[in-house]
């Protein structure tokens, strides 16, 4: 028998509950800002798992960052079996804070020292 993998969206704030100060706090950490930028530029509208990002950090650390982004309303996360995939809530963020995602897209990460 073949198992069926169901999709479940994890809890997140409704569009009208997304607060600018919470979004800015979530984006204030350079790693999270870079994760959101990568999703916007390289995978618009396509949910990605944490392995796709190629970040050399413990899985628990990445899970923490993804959770903060989701709870702030920046990303949505869906559970597919054992895998969680994230994507930016573009429509919701543009409706609440027009132009914010353009700033994220245009942000240039500092050069590595």
Spell out what each predicted region is.
Residues 22-58, 80-95:
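N-terminal helix-turn-helix DNA-binding core of bacterial DNA-binding proteins
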């Amino acid at each position: 028998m073949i198992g069926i993998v169901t999709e479940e969206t994890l809890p997140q704030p409704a569009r009208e509950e997304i607060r600018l100060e919470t979004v800015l706090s979530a984006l204030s950490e350079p790693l999270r800002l870079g994760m959101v930028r990568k999703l916007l530029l390289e995978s618009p509208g396509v949910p990605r798992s944490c392995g796709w990002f190629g970040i050399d950090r413990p899985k628990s650390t990445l899970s923490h960052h993804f959770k903060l982004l989701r709870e702030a309303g920046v990303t949505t996360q869906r559970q597919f079996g054992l895998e969680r995939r994230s994507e930016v809530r573009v429509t919701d963020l543009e409706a609440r804070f027009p132009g914010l995602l353009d700033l994220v897209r245009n942000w240039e990460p500092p050069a590595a020292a």
